[in-house]
Amino acid sequence: MTLFASSVLLAASLLSVPSQARTLFKYERIQLTQEYLDTLPQEDAQLFAFEDKFVAAPNKTATRCRYFPDDGKWPSDKAWTKLGKQLSSVDALIKPVPQAAVCYPGPIQDDVKCKQLTANWTNSYTHISDPTEILSPVYQGLTCQPPTIYNSGNCTLGGYPSYVINAKTVLDIQLGINFARNDGVRLVIKNTGHDFAGKSAGAGSLSLWTHNLKDITFFDKYVDDSGYTGPAIKAGAGVQAFELYKAASDHGVVVVAGEGQTVGVMGGYIQGGGHSPLSSLYGMAADNVLGFEIVTATGEFTTANSTNNQDLFWALRGGGGGTFGVVTSVTVKAYPEMPVTAASWSFDSTKIGKDRFWAGVRAYVDHFIDNVSNSTYSYFTISPNGNDVTFRMQPFFAPNKTLNTASNLLQPHWTTLTRLNIPINPKLTQYKSFYDAWQAEFPLEPQSDVQTAFGSRLFPRSNFESETGRNISFGALKDSVNAGQIIIAFNMAPALARGGNPDNAVNPAWRNSILHAITGRRWDVKSSANDILAARKSFTNGTMQKWRDVTPGSGSYLNEADRLEPNWQQSFWGNKYAKLLGIKRNYDPKDVFWAVNAVGSEGWTVESFDGLPNENGRLCMVNETISTTTSRMRAMEEPTPVMVV
């Protein structure tokens, strides 16, 4: 029997029988145990020891930066081989090669494969199934893209991790965490790589890839200690929206999850809050969580729910991914399947002129409050194209609404468009189920391009309650489009009451918001690093500052935010940040887990090789002390201002 196989069998045999409240998947029963570590040679045991048993070797924790592959104290090839042998499968440890390496001179260059890859490069599925790719490639450092998209001259790892563990068991995750912590290696977590800031990448890191933890269990009547009794679904960390929605539909229920097909629901999405086509009906995805299974920074596998690790449970529901631990599964509430009516329409300025075009857009803005008061969700874009502009609704999504009810909601807007002589050809469809509607109506979201940065803002209901407020907010959005920037927007209202009045870490700005708006800034693909930095700063301090100015005291959605967001602690969590920081210090005082703009990330920074904000560089400490950070956070507990109109 091989060493890794014996460790799996021993760990499984030593696991106690779980209580009814802790139903574990098979892969969660395969765990690393102290009993097994005690059988290893001392040198090997030290590599994989749990935190409370580990005595740091000299200088292992004294360095300013996490060790990098060209450092003398980077783990030896022998150490990496030992890690690979301990994992639950012989191929679990991956030394990654970028997909686009087939396009560059080298041993795997293949022009046919390069052509095929390039043709499918913007398809998100191309990147989701890869252990290292992310959907915001600008944060990888652009060191290996297909040359016709971005020619880097050669192909290097850049911001991709040096090693990846294809996690198939809790054992794999525990070994990865312990190895990285004990050897001073940067650790990152990748599920699907959707995060707008590139949190799933990291040069010189060991990455834990949770994408293949796909188990799903349905409970017809789940009895939770929180008082909830009803249907529920437990899903592995790697389960994506298209898989979760299908499983729910098969059992006649719906769950609160993302609109994007490829989003890894139980990873950073739900930990960051998670907005949904059902948010105006059932709140944020995080509001519907009943419990997490998680491996913490010490290597311990534990539960976080209403009765166990309650502080961690609070933090994981909205506090963000990549910083508190590695979630292996999540149990969420489910609701009865429902019919949905959806509508789509579009118009542009080509034949009607910009004045009438903007009057048509404003006509929809005037109905924001009415729409969300009826539990609807609108997903629309406003796109400049040269001298013209296009408004596209795809879709207006009305859960549990008949065709007539949805039509009546939209008729005032459509009547205004008719009065303005703006022609539209709306498509209005009633579906028998949420799943059918979601499949038919939401487009597949592509990978972002290589010369764009995004930012977002939550616009509160108060901004749209008066004519003056609507004018101010609409003006800020219009100015961005007139400056050449696309707007991607969501009209929804995940109010606290909609989510069942939970106490969790979700950004309080969400509770008063009825518009989540995203925009981006492009630059020339051949721009120098200095020009890119100038464009980024202009975007952050220009367009996004105008949005902040008209929404004082509000915030931004951390999963879809500007990486350079100023005062991000307040923007992502408001007055909840001080509590989150305390929980981070309690569960991960050594910052084993780090991600940009994550809770507790202030003490570290990526020193990128090109000086740009990306993951292509060493992770190093900065001079700011925790006490300084904490005192600044306390100031955030004071009430924040609102726009008075």
Residue ranges and their predicted role:
Residues R22-V645:
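Soluble FAD-dependent oxygen oxidases
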Residues M1-T23, V645:
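Fungal secretory targeting signals
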